[in-house]
Curated annotation (Swiss-Prot):
Residues 334-347 have a biased composition (Polar residues). The keyword rRNA processing does not apply. It is found in: Virion tegument. Residues 322-466, 486-537 are annotated as: Disordered. Its main location: virion. Pfam families: DUF832. It comes from the Viruses. Residues 492-517 have a biased composition (Acidic residues). Keywords: Virion, Virion tegument. GO terms for cellular component: viral tegument. This is Tegument protein BRRF2.
Length: 537
């Protein structure tokens, strides 16, 4: 390959042109990830079998050819595509700092001064909020952060891991150790720490910490991308300057034409070949010009408002700080709910876990256990008469569920919970139990018996039946728990002062009771006697 050709002259014998051309082509296209601007000079020396300390003209000419081919190469083009991402990261970090630490930052700050302001703010926050040995250790990690392709040490106390830190360190490891390429597919949310990735702080301090950390992570992403974009050009210029100094004893000239003319003077008929290049000679200010395209504040690419939405509103990857519900107020000791309403909560819970009880329609409220037991005993004692039955109100279907025997002082409450339409019969003042019809037995016979004896039994007999039922329930706790699922019976004197036989408060942590009507305060802390106490009209 002798003769004058367009391109950069490479002063090596023609028999070495094949191996050297392949090496230089792999560097320009980026196919060989092991090649970089820092080690390409050594690779060239190995390819031409030149010992260290030998003539630098061959290596100098090869480096100059790569320098002229770099701006339009596929290797540099893939890095230029990351310039908008780097500008966005820097602009976002800058605007986040102006929002939370406006006194320590300004529009004229360099990325390095911005990093120092963020580190100072985080160090002060860790000391003021806790100051334990772990926090002090993280202060050293913050101080050790350096701009560039460096991993982030431990900087957040009282946390096991942080997703943005893992992402950035993995990216650095891929670029430095594995010599990989960067293909960014992320948005600002992945560089915003979640609320569980910071220490347990007050709400205002938590927002401040997450904002400063998000600014720090965006700034670190900028430093990584900046070095990745400009590293090859800077390393190649440094190698070119060193070999020019070794060959001539002078610093690198300002114009590339000086170096080209120097190399052309060594060209003979059999000691060179040309590497084709396009375009003019690459200026030696190329790294600085490339850096000027990266270190830019562009408000059109800023994602600071999006990061603030993630932090303050809990959208995207960020999750708002959890709010724990307050415990329900202590219930009144006066019975204000009917038995059917109290037991319906347990039956609703049972239906969710075990399905619909056999023989019970979803549209029919559960049968009151007092009614069933009292009615069956009344039939046995009185020979099956209907003295315990009230007349069915007109217009009411026989399928209407019975009213609880514990009559509420308000008639409207009885109609609401027991499903009775029309006018309701008030309990006489001499009786505290209002007996009603039971679903067991023939409904027509019960209606007829109710018409014959519409008046309820005496209060004395009703109280005796009720006390008998209470004794039966105390004898068999399992039946009580089955009939009143959702409530639990506690034993003797507990730590909270509740007595034997009392129902403790509903367990709010049980998922079965979440969403029940009444907010979990119904029946809490009441005994059997208080739940089914004899009412006085």
């Amino acid at each position: 390959m002798s003769g004058q050709q367009r391109g950069s002259v490479i002063l090596v014998p023609e028999h070495l042109a094949g191996a050297l051309t392949k090496l230089m082509s792999d560097f320009i296209t980026g196919q060989d990830v092991t090649l970089s601007g820092g080690n390409i000079a050594v690779k060239i020396r190995d390819a031409i079998n030149q010992t260290p300390g030998g003539g630098d003209v061959a290596i100098l000419s090869s480096l100059f050819a790569l320098w002229n081919a770099l701006p339009t190469s596929g290797r540099q083009s893939s890095r230029d595509d990351l310039i908008p991402a780097a500008v966005q990261a820097l602009t976002t970090a800058h605007n986040l700092c102006l929002g939370v630490i406006p006194g320590e930052t300004s529009h004229k700050d360099t990325p390095e001064s911005l990093l120092r302001a963020i580190v100072t703010g985080l160090q002060k926050l860790w000391v003021d909020s806790c100051g334990c040995p772990e926090c002090l250790q993280c202060l050293k990690g913050l101080k050790a952060i350096k701009p560039g392709l460096y991993e982030i040490p431990r900087i957040i106390p009282h946390t096991k891991q942080c997703s943005p830190v893992n992402l950035l360190n993995m990216l650095v490891h891929k670029l430095v150790a594995l010599r990989g390429h960067v293909q960014l597919a992320y948005d600002a949310r992945v560089l915003t720490p979640d609320f569980h990735e910071i220490p347990d702080l007050d709400d205002s301090d938590a927002v401040f910490a997450r904002t400063l950390l998000a600014a720090l992570f965006h700034l670190n992403m900028f430093f990584i991308l900046k070095d990745y974009i400009t590293q090859d050009s800077m390393s190649l210029k440094q190698a070119l300057s060193g070999h020019w100094m070794s060959a001539t004893g002078n610093p690198l000239p300002a114009a590339p034409e000086t170096l080209r003319n120097y190399l052309e003077a060594f060209r003979n008929s059999d000691n060179h070949f040309y590497l084709p290049t396009t375009g003019p000679l690459n200026t030696f200010k190329f790294p600085e010009e490339l850096l000027g395209r990266v270190v830019v504040i562009d408000s059109s690419l800023c994602a600071a408002s999006h990061v603030q939405d993630v932090i303050t509103r809990g959208v995207g990857a960020g999750v708002p700080r959890p709010r724990f519900l307050a415990l329900p107020p202590a219930p009144s000791r006066e019975p204000q709910q009917t038995c059917s309403q109290l037991t319906s909560r347990g039956n609703e819970s049972s239906r969710r876990n075990l399905g619909q009880p056999g023989g019970t329609s979803p549209a029919v409220p559960p049968v009151c256990p007092i009614v069933s037991l009292a009615a069956s005993r009344a039939k046995q004692n009185r020979g099956g008469t209907g003295s315990l039955h009230l007349a069915q109100p007109e217009g009411t279907s026989p399928a209407v569920s019975p009213v609880c025997p514990i009559a509420s002082p308000a008639a409207s409450r009885s109609k609401q919970h027991c499903g009775v339409t029309g006018s309701s019969q008030a309990a006489p003042s001499s009786s505290s139990v209002t007996p009603v019809a039971s679903l067991s037995g023939d409904l027509e016979e019960e209606e007829e018996g109710s018409r014959e004896s519409p008046s309820p039994p005496s209060s004395k007999k009703g109280a005796e039946e009720f006390e008998a039922w209470l004794e039966a329930q105390d004898a068999n706790l399992e039946d009580v728990q089955r009939e009143f699922s959702g409530l639990r019976v506690i034993g003797d004197e507990d730590e909270d002062g509740s007595e034997d036989g009392e129902f403790s408060d509903l367990d709010l942590s049980d998922s079965d009771h979440e969403g029940d009507e009444g907010g979990g305060a119904v029946g809490g802390g009441r005994s059997l006697h208080s739940l089914y106490s004899l009412s006085v009209v």
